[in-house]
From Swiss-Prot:
SMART domains: ZnF_C2HC. Disruption phenotype: Completely abolishes the ability to produce any liamocins. Blocks the expression of the PKS1 gene and reduced expression of the EST1 gene. Keywords: Metal-binding, Nucleus, Zinc, Zinc-finger. One of its GO terms (molecular function) is zinc ion binding. A zinc finger (CCHC-type) spans 240-255. It is found in: Nucleus. The gene is GAL1. This is Transcription factor GAL1. It comes from the Eukaryota.
Length: 272
């Protein structure tokens, strides 16, 4: 540790000696005024930095000289192009914003030129929905007079007649479609009304049938009474110990009830 500390101190001392030996490059302040903070913080480049820069420049010069010598030995020549741009540099044109509504976009009319671009060529405006054939030709001619040609002018009467015929055909077709739709809707409403009436009649009949049905609460046949149904099924296979018949238990035997009545009338004892 002592050696390391001593070596670092020696290096610092050598660095300070080199800095003091080097000539100051910072300008002196006039009239003995105190220099500003930026001037005081600026330090002159160290000798190591200058030596490194000089070595790099010398290495680059040697490299260029070697390349030129090798090219000369190979018979190659060095060409230097000096091109001067005589055209003045103009600033890049910014984005041109044009406000247009849906009508102008659909019509396909050219967008008017702006005041800044009067000298430049203006291309046709953007088109949205385009029409083809004989559809809406009159509107397109109003917006674009160039679309009309001599042949189209000669055939204008024939095209107008055909357009009117097409419009009449379209009107008749639309009327037929509307009539068919109305007829189908009326038929569907009648079918739904008849179905509702049939459902109402059926529900009334079922309600009357439920009201007229006799319900025995002792023999309920619901979903929650599965144990009772199983018991009734088992009883149907059992034989009575009193009369010997199947289908009832001893406590439900009609002969036993009849015997009990006879014994009560006679005042005898009851068999249990």
């Amino acid at each position: 540790m002592a050696g390391k500390n001593m070596s670092s101190r020696l290096l610092n001392m050598k660095f300070m000696q080199r800095a003091s030996a080097s000539t100051p490059t910072t300008p002196t302040t006039p009239d003995g005024t105190r220099p500003s903070k930026r001037l005081r913080t600026e330090a002159a480049p160290s000798p190591e930095t200058r030596a490194f820069q000089e070595a790099a420049a010398a290495e680059e010069a040697k490299k260029n000289a070697f390349i030129e010598r090798a090219a000369a030995e190979a018979g190659e020549t060095k060409w230097v192009l000096s091109v001067s741009d005589d055209k003045p540099k103009t600033a890049g044109q910014g984005l041109r914003i044009v406000e247009a509504g849906y009508g102008a976009i659909d019509s396909g009319a050219p967008i008017p030129e702006s005041d800044d671009d009067q000298d430049e060529e203006q291309s046709a405006g953007m088109a949205g929905r385009r029409s083809f054939g004989k559809f809406n030709k009159a509107v397109e001619r109003q917006h674009n007079p160039d679309l009309s040609s001599p042949e189209s002018e000669q055939d204008s009467d024939a095209s107008s007649d055909s357009d009117s015929d097409d419009d009449e055909d379209l009107d008749e077709a639309e009327l037929l479609i509307k009539a068919e739709r109305k007829e189908a809707a009326a038929k569907l409403r009648a079918e739904r009304k008849a179905q509702r009436k049939a459902d109402e009649v059926k529900s009334k009949q079922m309600a009357e049938r439920r009201r007229s049905r006799d319900i025995n609460l002792n023999k309920v046949g619901g979903i929650s009474n599965a144990a009772i149904r199983n018991k009734q099924a088992n009883v149907a296979n059992m034989a009575c110990h009193v009369c010997g018949q199947k289908g009832h238990l001893q406590k439900d035997c009609p002969d036993r009830k009849q015997r009990r009545g006879d014994k009560r009338k006679s005042g005898g004892a009851m068999d249990y």
